[in-house]
Amino acid sequence: MIRMAFAVACGGVIGTLLRFALATWVSAQWPRHFYLATVAVNLLGCLLIGYLYATFLARPDISPELRGALIIGFLGALTTFSSFSLDALRLLESGQLATAFAYVGGSVLGGLLAAWAGLALARL
């Protein structure tokens, strides 16, 4: 358990630093489009989680610690959108279309509503 926690923490540090670097660079390139930095890290995270998922399926010998460092730590720090996308992809791949669409729609709408609620609470 300690080894896994350390691996996840190490991956998280790297993911955090990459997110900071990418967001800083993208924001400097397109300062009027604040959302592009988030889109960039989310899309990168989705690309990477798809790649890693396929790699881990093909290579079951990859250690749980490395898997945890990359998926939970690195991509978790880079973006949680990648995990959301993988969950939706797995639902689609398993033929659970209604659940996948409910998950995607509910997550997006729920996220927007939660962000709005947080904004409203902060303004009280």
Swiss-Prot record:
It is a multi-pass membrane protein. The lineage of its organism: Bacteria, Pseudomonadati, Pseudomonadota, Gammaproteobacteria, Pseudomonadales. Na(+) is not transported, but it plays an essential structural role and its presence is essential for fluoride channel function. The chain crosses the membrane at residues 6-26, 34-54, 69-89, 101-121. GO terms for molecular function: fluoride channel activity; metal ion binding. It catalyses: fluoride(in) = fluoride(out). Its main location: membrane. Belongs to the fluoride channel Fluc/FEX (TC 1.A.43) family. It comes from Stutzerimonas stutzeri (strain A1501) (Pseudomonas stutzeri). Na(+) binds at G76, T79. The keyword Membrane applies. One of its GO terms (cellular component) is plasma membrane. It is found in: Cell inner membrane. Fluoride-specific ion channel. Important for reducing fluoride concentration in the cell, thus reducing its toxicity. GO terms for biological process: cellular detoxification of fluoride. InterPro entries: FluC. Signal peptide: none annotated. This is Fluoride-specific ion channel FluC. Keywords: Cell inner membrane, Cell membrane, Ion channel, Ion transport, Membrane, Metal-binding, Sodium, Transmembrane, Transmembrane helix, Transport. The keyword Isomerase does not apply.
